[in-house]
């Protein structure tokens, strides 16, 4: 029990997170210029990213300068190596909360679809499929599954891709020999 006799539970944890997020919002986030805030929100959906992904997802050719400014003036970014960048988990949770408040579903889907394109160009099909699924682009999911099945016939990738195959309508699978082969 806490002070006041209230039991410690999920409601208390949710309230604590809410208060921390309100603090982050007023003490940190709102002090940034609009381009930095937009940049942070557009990268938040991704566990990690590199400069190329930051450019592609945000559409900002100035992404390198923005990342450099964030690196020099904040401690919110972690670098795995010279290329891979992450937000600190607590700050990423805040940014995702902020993203839910500031961006429409359509704008969030567009971010995931741009992330999907980045991964597709890198031939990282599992991440591309995840992004396109979250972005609601089922035609790209189907296209990538067909491409993957044609690139790796009979290689047993079905278990890795099963949830994406199952998300497709049966009629679409039956209309594509490559999709049927990929499921076998």
Where are the regions a protein language model picked out?
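Extended alpha-helical scaffolding segments used for macromolecular assembly and cargo binding
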Residues: 105-183
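Short acidic/histidine-centered micro-motifs embedded in hydrophobic/aromatic stretches
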Residues: 1-4, 42-43, 57, 69, ...
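Residue-level marker of structural boundaries
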Residues: 3, 45-48, 63, 72-76, ...
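Short, polar/flexible loop-turn hinges at active-site or ligand-entry regions and domain interfaces
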Residues: 6-11, 60-61, 99-105
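Flexible, glycine- and charge-enriched loops at secondary-structure boundaries
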Residues: 14, 18, 60-63, 105, ...
